[in-house]
Amino acid sequence: ISRWRGYHGSGLISGSLTGLAVFHNKFDLPLDRILHTVTPHYLRRPDKDMKEEQFTEYCVDSLKKMISDEGAETIAAFIGEPILGTGGIIPPPKGYWEAIQKVLEDNDIMFIADEVVTGFGRLGTMFGSEHYSLRPDIITIAKGLTSAYAPLSGSIFSNKVWKVLEQGTDELGPIGHGWTY
């Protein structure tokens, strides 16, 4: 599950996760197995009479319904930027991340924090996840890693994810993870 207006790249899977029509039009994206939930952009809320806390509840309820409709067991992960990069560097509404993280934990859904924009001190903490007290299973990193002087990216895994990767490596051999620029 990703979010509309979120940006995660322009390849087949990352473009599908990106919630922007310009990355989908004429490319048969997003892939069917990729879901998008509502954008946590308070100024673009569907009902202008909603207070910020009500909008947070609306976002959370939308995610809960999606998970219920699809079945939590069919959902591998939720990906989101701590602060929505596309559309103007938009912080989430009050209480959003705390509530979203609880929904993910309650449904045993992995949480991926896309820290390409918010990582490496841009919010006053090393990662945007720290700023919002998030506990992601995976963190994606890039631009700030080299101050954008060189094309370098990476992933940081929680111990829970690392143990699964380590076990898989023992059984299946090394896991190839890389990209050619």
Place the predicted regions along the sequence by residue.
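Conserved N-terminal phosphate-binding loop of PLP-dependent enzymes in the Aspartate aminotransferase
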Residues: 1-181
